[in-house]
Every structure is written in C-alpha cells, then in structure tokens.
C-alpha cells in the first residue's frame, strides 16, 4: 500500500467539504491511531494484518486531509511503551516499518509531486540500526518539500520528548551558548521534536479510549480533543468530518485560550527582565526606580542579547540534529 493514496473525494463528500470549509478549518491534526489489534481480533485475522490495515487507513486519511486543505498531520505510530509488548509483535511492527519506509523511498516522485515532507519524531536510537538508516534516508529525501507535512511519531512518548528538550537546554548552558536565565517555557517549546510545527488544532483518538497515552502532552494543551469509538482501520471520511465540526464549535474558546496563554508568557518574561534590570541597577548603586529611559535601554539590551544567544543555540542544536541524521542516511546509501 502506498503512503499517498491519490484520488478525489466523492461528489457527496466534496459537497459537504465545501460547506465545512466556510468555517474555520484546522491547519494541523494529530491522530492516535488506536484499535488495530481489536480490529484484527474482530475480523479473526493476525495482529500483523490489523497493523497493515491501519497503515492503509493512514494513507486514505492523508488523502482526505489533503483534499480538505489540512496540510499537516501528526500520527502516533509507535510508543516507547510498545517495546513492552511481546517480542513477536514488536518484531512484526519493526518489519512493517522497514517495509513501509522502503516503499516510501520507491515513491519519491509521488512525494515530490505533492511536496510531502516526512518527519520522524522520537528517539531513533532505540530502533534497530537498519531501520534508523531507512528512516534517515526518507527524512533526508523529503526535507526540502514544503507543501504538506507528515510527522510520524516513532519510538516516542511526550515525557521522553520533554526530558530530551531539558537535556538539550542543559547542553546549551554547558557549551556556553545559553545563560541559565535564558531557560523558559518558550525555549523548551523550541527544543521539542515538534519545534518546526504549529501545535495541533485537533487531536483525534480512535477506538473509544479516553486518554492521551503520553502523546503530545505539551503541544495539545489548547487543542480540541476528540475521542471517537470507531476502530482505526474502520475510520471514515465522516468521522473526520465530525471531528472538524467539533473543532469549529469550540474554535473561539480555543483561540481565546491560546491568545491568553501567549500574552501570559510575554508578561512573565517581561517581569523576569525587569527584575534582572532592577538587580543590575542596585548592584551599580543606582536607584531601582530611577531614570525610566535608562531602564528601557537596559531592558532592550537584555532582550536583544538573550535573543541573540537563543538563536545561536537553536542553530547549533538544529545543526547537531541534522548532522547526525545526514551521517546516518549516508551510511546506508
């Protein structure tokens, strides 16, 4: 089965899609593709067949999203917790991943045609080396495409992602790229695997389970959470349509919460900067409440220097990650 399933919506689907597009549309949807094993049991087939059908449904769902103008999709393909499953099932999932990433490399022309950028998010060091190399090749082959984006979370949990981001910031301080005072929520956000993506507008979980299973916990604090009873391989265009309707009904509340959170971040940063400037002035024997122009000048310099350090650190971090991926992809070429 192809990664990209080409084709148009049916006449009725197109009609309903045009209606729903009159409202606010999500730009980024995340999926917890749950229910493959229960589907296999229901259909009395092997678990591996259930996972294969789940991948086929992903390709179909990407087609729906593309036709609806939803240009970024993130999927929870394999949790670090899944390594605790039986060896036979884990081995089967690794084999399926090998097949699908090998197939992806055979479809480079189709990916180029649609401008699909594939990103794989997670701790790839936990995967077999040959699979790491296949993933690196796929990511490298599509990294310059920018019409639409598929983020595959593989060997991923949100706690692992956040702890890794904290380690990256600590590395920046150790290397002298950052000051300890530069550490903030905003910087942590930029150190996550998802740093190049906007936060999801909708998170959809299938199979009826009402939990996030350690998926995008940081990124979905202001997302529309939709839990649907359908098993993932049985997901339909109308299930997606329903999720978008829920998003539209809650859009104004979600947007207001996002705006308030962004303003609160700015306020907290300004308070920290003001406290730092006050401390500097007192150390120099000047009145903390003295010359307003001097305080503004100091605040501006403090902010500019921090931004310069942060940008230098982020460039170094991106270079470090890209270099590792490039060397991995070259090793298997």
Swiss-Prot record:
GO terms for cellular component: dehydrodolichyl diphosphate synthase complex; endoplasmic reticulum; endoplasmic reticulum membrane. Keywords: Disease variant, Endoplasmic reticulum, Epilepsy, Intellectual disability, Lipid metabolism, Magnesium, Membrane, Metal-binding, Retinitis pigmentosa, Transferase. Optimum pH is 8-9. Active from pH 5.5 to 9.3. It catalyses: n isopentenyl diphosphate + (2E,6E)-farnesyl diphosphate = a di-trans,poly-cis-polyprenyl diphosphate + n diphosphate. Changing residue 42 to E: In RP59; 5-fold reduction in catalytic activity and reduced affinity for FPP but not for IPP. InterPro entries: UPP_synth-like (IPR001441), UPP_synth-like_CS (IPR018520), UPP_synth-like_sf (IPR036424). (2E,6E)-farnesyl diphosphate binds at residues 34-35, 37-38, 85. Pfam families: Prenyltransf. It is found in: Endoplasmic reticulum membrane. Disulfide bonds: none annotated. Activated by phospholipids including cardiolipin, phosphatidylcholine, phosphatidylethanolamine, phosphatidylinositol and phosphatidylserine. With NUS1, forms the dehydrodolichyl diphosphate synthase (DDS) complex, an essential component of the dolichol monophosphate (Dol-P) biosynthetic machinery. Both subunits contribute to enzymatic activity, i.e. condensation of multiple copies of isopentenyl pyrophosphate (IPP) to farnesyl pyrophosphate (FPP) to produce dehydrodolichyl diphosphate (Dedol-PP), a precursor of dolichol phosphate which is utilized as a sugar carrier in protein glycosylation in the endoplasmic reticulum (ER). Synthesizes long-chain polyprenols, mostly of C95 and C100 chain length. The catalytic site at NUS1-DHDDS interface accomodates both the allylic and the homoallylic IPP substrates to the S1 and S2 pockets respectively. The beta-phosphate groups of IPP substrates form hydrogen bonds with the RXG motif of NUS1 and four conserved residues of DHDDS (Arg-85, Arg-205, Arg-211 and Ser-213), while the allylic isopentenyl group is pointed toward the hydrophobic tunnel of the S1 pocket where the product elongation occurs. This is Dehydrodolichyl diphosphate synthase complex subunit DHDDS.
